[in-house]
């Protein structure tokens, strides 16, 4: 947003090796920007095609810009390109960056497992990105069979009582003497006090599920005289700032090509995406209706539960229900 409003143009014709590095040479921004000011700047600069690269918030911004362009009857194409590690863009099965983030997340999980196994009743706790969608946590769990509990925003859980996380963790320690827990950052928010404050983009500020788990695990185990050692790993931005995997590089290249083809063919107000191995054009209004979330009745989530062996913890929806 800021680079368009200023405007600040960047010559990229000589940047032939940018695909080898993480990050972005274009920069990024957070917070609402005025669609009117952006379109004013596009007009002044004689820009006829705008590519908006990003996640759910960026696609909503693209929709606002597209509507402002249409209201002025301007000939400016607005094309969205999905890029978010959270994989939470509606109708986009997999966004660019997701595979890379999952790959890096597995390294953190492997470290947590190593630490947990290195001491009696060792517990490795890993917090991964995923404010409202638990795709990274679920996919990384499936990739690493060492995970014993996975917690995601879409599946509430209880701490104590029958089927609670803490009794299940106690049983795990009694039988195997170590455990690994993976939690998406948005998991367990129903157990935390939240102020209701928001960030610059209007997202609710989350409580820290890792702090909750660390304190509650210590309280529960100490009360029962169970010696334990908990090691906490938060890879945070590491999983999104690394160079892309080979598959993500290829995927990104195709997304860029199809986005340019769409714009040159006169398309606008759309997002380019890949569905069932076909690159398609999706209306911006469609992909911004809601945020894509992990379906807890899906094969993916059921496989994650089977991989961990945790089953449905108390508070999660019953497994026997069907998704209508």
Across the structure, where does each feature detected by a protein language model lie?
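Glycine-rich oxoanion-binding loops at beta->alpha junctions
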Residues: 1-50, 57-59, 85, 96-103, ...
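C-terminal non-catalytic interaction/assembly regions of soluble proteins
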Residues: 197-324
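Short, ordered loop/turn segments at secondary-structure junctions
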Residues: 1, 30-31, 55-56, 81-87, ...
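Flexible loop/turn segments at secondary-structure boundaries
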Residues: 1-2, 34, 59-60, 88, ...
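Short, high-confidence coil segments that cap the C-terminus of an alpha-helix
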Residues: 47, 177-178, 268
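Short beta-strand elements at the ligand-binding edges of bilobed clamshell
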Residues: 90-102, 243-246
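Accessory alpha-helical/coil subdomains and C-terminal extensions
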Residues: 41, 52-54, 60-75, 79, ...
């Amino acid at each position: 947003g800021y680079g368009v409003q200023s405007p600040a143009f960047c010559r990229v014709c000589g940047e032939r090796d940018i695909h080898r590095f993480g990050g972005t040479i274009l920069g990024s921004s957070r917070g609402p920007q005025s669609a009117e000011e952006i379109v004013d700047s596009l007009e002044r600069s004689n820009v006829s095609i705008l590519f908006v690269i990003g996640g759910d918030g960026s696609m909503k911004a693209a929709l606002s810009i597209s509507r402002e362009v249409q209201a002025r009857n301007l000939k400016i194409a607005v094309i969205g390109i999905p890029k978010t590690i959270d994989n939470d863009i509606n109708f986009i099965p997999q966004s660019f960056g997701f595979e890379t983030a999952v790959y890096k997340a597995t390294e953190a999980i492997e470290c947590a497992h190593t630490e947990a196994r290195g001491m009696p009743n060792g517990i490795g706790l890993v917090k991964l990105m995923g404010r409202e969608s638990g795709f990274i946590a679920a996919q990384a769990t499936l990739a690493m069979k060492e995970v014993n509990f996975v917690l995601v925003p879409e599946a509430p859980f209880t701490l104590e009582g029958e089927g609670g996380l803490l009794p299940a963790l106690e049983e795990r320690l009694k039988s195997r003497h170590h455990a690994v827990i993976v939690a998406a950052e948005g998991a367990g928010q129903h157990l935390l006090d939240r102020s209701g404050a928001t960030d610059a983009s209007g997202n609710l500020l989350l409580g820290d599920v890792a702090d909750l788990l660390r304190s509650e695990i210590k309280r529960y185990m100490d009360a029962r005289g169970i010696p334990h050692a908990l090691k906490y790993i938060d890879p945070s931005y590491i999983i999104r700032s690394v160079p892309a995997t080979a598959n993500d590089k290829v995927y990104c290249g195709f997304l860029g090509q199809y986005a340019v083809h769409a714009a040159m063919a006169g398309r606008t107000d759309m997002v380019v995406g890949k569905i069932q191995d076909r690159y398609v054009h999706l209306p911006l209004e469609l992909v911004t209706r809601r945020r894509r979330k992990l379906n807890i009745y899906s094969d993916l989530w059921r496989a994650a539960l089977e991989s961990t062996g945790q089953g449905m913890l108390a508070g999660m929806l019953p497994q026997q229900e069907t998704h209508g």
